[in-house]
Amino acid sequence: MYPQQSVEEGFKLIETRSYNEAIKVFTAIVQKDSSNLEALKGLARAWNGAGDMPRAIQIYKLSLNKDPSQFDIWVAYGNLFYNKGNSKKAAKSYRQAIKYDSTHVRGLNNLAMVLKDLRDYDEAETYFLKAIYFDSTYSLAMRNLGDIYLKQQKTEKAILWLEKARIADPKSLYGLYWLGRAHVQNNNIQQGIKCFLEVLAEKPDLPQVNHDLGKAYFANRNYKKALDHVQYALKRNSSMIPYHITLSHIYDHMHQEKKAFAALQDALTIDRSVAEIYIERGNIHKNAGRFEDALKEYNLAALIKPELWLSHYKSGVALYYLTRLDEAETAFLKAEELQSENGSIYHFLGMVSLARDNNKAAENRLLEAAKLDDTNGDIWFHLGEVQMRTEQWEDAENSLLKSYDIDSYNAETLYGLGQVYKKLGKLDRSLEYLYRFKEVEEFERNTESLNKRIRLHPNDITLRLRLATLYEDQNRVDQAVPILRQAAYLGSIEAENKLKTILEKIRP
């Protein structure tokens, strides 16, 4: 019945998803002419469309045995393995495609995608660049290259390539979304928000974009918009555990502990074996000063996912504050084994050494921490502290000044500078920093007292208004604004009016 029908008609049936009819057409052709490679290709595609992947693999293999130089078939063959999660076989197939056509951009891109999934970022970068070299309009390869740079924290490079992808394919909402992620990661929060809003203007129901927009608003401490978008994302897809974790994180930042735990409980009803849920539960306990409870949660996370460095690091932090130094060091060393280039790990290893009065080890670890994360004021303070202990006064001055440049309100840094200048004989400067230290210390006592009361009474708007006023009186408007936003979210008209006045003053 079908031998007279053409290969073209078979492919038209595939386009209309009439896979069983297409299988009959191509089978009839192949039975008459088993060397018809186009019919074999169509038959494999039809079997794949019908959901019979093993049969599709068998047909592709038969076709390649007849002519191994079919680079398009090697790519299609590789795609089947990639979709099954067999990255090694997929990569082998894509390499065969490139062997027969070194300019095959899909083969180059797909091989790079597999390598990216395998975290072989350097080789993946090479193949993405080759794909772009042979097709300067290949926006998919540009987006993938940008994603590699995002994963490597090379945000400026990521933005460059994602902008190029946007120019190559201005209609791609996916490219615009990735560009927004890159801007947020590069701390261009407002630019990231703009990209996300452009995507949602076209497709307002996308849960992932709403979630990431909510996170971006949270980074700007716009709590109402953050909660609105994250909650909308959950409404669209309530099974996404990261959305529940983000919601919990926002609530905890607002001292809404019950709501924070409730969000995580919803996540646990979906899957109790996700380590990140227990880490977030631990964070809530830690932020409230309950280190034993925090440690239990972090240890659970480490049991569930022992390969996750963050679980061990968090356990180490809790153990450090519980003064269980040997156990803390063991946890940090395990984290270091899993994530060797992380400033926070070396920072706490240095603090463990400081607590043991092992100044040499402390200095070495803190120097490594500062090298990996030179924008962390606490690292520079602790480095200055150990240099003070070993009477390296000039080095201590330099370290403490770097800490001060990052955070001029750090009371410990101010006190340290006062002591250093006293030792260096610069008494005027010493008195200046010590006087400033007393001011900040008193301010911190007052804010800490209010924060404790807010955690106990999270719906008390008056307490938040008093806290915001404390920051305003110190001209620390950037810290007053998020607290006023919290109060406004809870329904304070006074906070809304204050916010409006402050934002009008600081708006460029």
Show the residue positions of the predicted features.
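Terminal, low-structured helical/coil segments at or just beyond the last alpha-helical repeat
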Residues: 431, 439, 448-508
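Alpha-helical segment of the N-proximal tetratricopeptide repeat
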Residues: 5-28, 32, 42-49, 79, ...
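Structural signature of tandem alpha-helical TPR/SEL1-like repeats
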Residues: 15-24, 49-62, 83-96, 117-130, ...
